[in-house]
A protein has these predicted regions:
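Helix-loop-helix
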Residues: 152-178, 243-311
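Hydrophobic alpha-helical transmembrane segments of ABC transporter permease domains
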Residues: 122-171, 258
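Membrane-integrated ABC transporters
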Residues: 1-35, 41-68, 82, 86, ...
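Transmembrane-helix motif of ABC transporter permease domains
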Residues: 7-31, 51-92, 162-186, 277-291
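Juxtamembrane helix-loop junctions of ABC transporter transmembrane domains
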Residues: 31-40, 44-47, 71-110, 130, ...
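Hydrophobic alpha-helical transmembrane segments of multi-pass integral membrane proteins
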Residues: 15-31, 35, 66-78, 135-151, ...
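An intracellular "coupling" helix at the cytosolic face of ABC transporter transmembrane type-1 domains
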Residues: 124, 200-207, 211-257, 261, ...
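Short cytosolic helices in intracellular loops of multi-pass membrane proteins
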Residues: 94-111, 189-232, 291-298, 307-319
Length: 327
């Protein structure tokens, strides 16, 4: 799966492409930091205007809005361009995988589900990596940028439960997000989400194989066998829906609770009127960005489960090819 980074033909795309993607993601995060700063200044201006009529000019108001438009426009431009580039980058990654599979397909074609591995799983791998990989890197970069901002903003203000401790906001975010993440990972393990996804793909592959064989020779498509295979597919799908019912109930209850966490943390500060509206917006947004990054596993868990399942199938496929070569 990772020959893309060692094959000479793809070295330029793999390494230079990775550098371009990482650099652009870093630029996006830096723009996000500036947008967060803008929110603080804009809401302070709004508070000033509402508390004292005509305390700001219409020119100052429009200038602030145009400042946001320029930042948002730059962010969108970078995002669109790098999304286009990332799609090409990951298709090249898929091409590197597929080319190797093509070179050994004469030996691999006898392995059950070989066609699905080469065509379907490689495209799944590239599409999942496009969303999952970039969001992971961006989450790490957001933490690097926003944790110092959150620490700076929390100096000298009282935080619920932690008091005036400088690291109160960060500690609260870590306790809530990591605690929830660990709980949901444990729940996913108890519910065997990865195992169920893997079993589902195996059942679907067996069912598809019989149908494909039947296209060329109807005698090989015994109605009893087809019905039994589809019955297995139906049962594993129902099992997966049932397991995700519990997981989604826990996941979305937790994520909805996260909405009010920054306001709970800032309750003593807000009640005493120790800060401005702009400060509250700036700190709650920074808190939310840190929370969102720490919740990467929670928000991406279903996709992570699918990626693990795809990787497991591809590794098993490559292992079967090696076994056939050694015979």
């Amino acid at each position: 799966m990772f020959r893309f980074f060692v094959i000479k033909k793809w070295l330029l795309w793999s390494w230079i492409g990775s550098f371009v993607i990482l650099t652009s993601l870093w630029v996006q995060v830096k723009i996000d930091v500036e947008i967060n700063k803008w929110f603080g200044e804009f809401y302070d201006m709004i508070q000033k205007a509402l508390s004292k009529p005509n305390s700001i000019t219409i020119e100052e108001y429009w200038e602030s809005l145009f400042s946001f438009i320029s930042l948002a426009g730059l962010y969108v431009s970078v995002y669109v361009i790098i999304s286009f580039f990332t799609a090409h980058f990951l298709f090249r990654w898929r091409a590197a995988m597929v080319e190797w599979y093509h070179s050994v397909y004469e030996r691999a074609s006898k392995i059950e589900g070989a066609a699905q591995r080469v065509q379907e799983d490689t495209i799944k791998f590239s599409r999942i990596m496009e969303s999952l990989g970039t969001s992971l890197i961006e989450s790490i970069m957001v933490l690097i940028q926003f944790i110092p901002i959150l620490l700076g903003l929390s100096v000298g203000i009282p935080i619920f439960f932690f008091g005036d401790w400088q690291y109160g906001l960060i500690s609260g975010a870590l306790i809530w997000t990591l605690g929830g993440t660990i709980f949901l990972i444990a729940l996913g393990w108890i519910l065997r989400l990865v195992g169920v996804e893997y079993d589902l793909q195996k059942k679907e592959a067996a069912y598809r194989k019989v149908l494909v064989l039947g296209e060329d020779n109807l005698e090989k498509t015994n109605p009893t066998i087809v019905n039994n295979l589809y019955d297995g597919v139906r049962k594993i799908h129902y099992k997966m829906y049932f397991h995700y019912l519990y997981f989604n109930a826990a996941k979305w209850s937790y994520l909805q609770g996260m909405v009010i966490v920054p306001y709970i943390a800032l309750a003593p500060t807000i009640i005493t009127g120790a800060v401005t509206l702009g400060f509250v917006q700036q700190i709650s947004r920074a808190f939310g960005r840190v929370e969102s990054s720490l919740q990467y596993l929670v928000r991406s868990w279903p996709i992570i489960v699918e990626l693990i399942s795809v990787r497991r199938r591809l590794l098993e496929f490559e292992r079967q090819i090696e076994i056939n070569d050694n015979r």
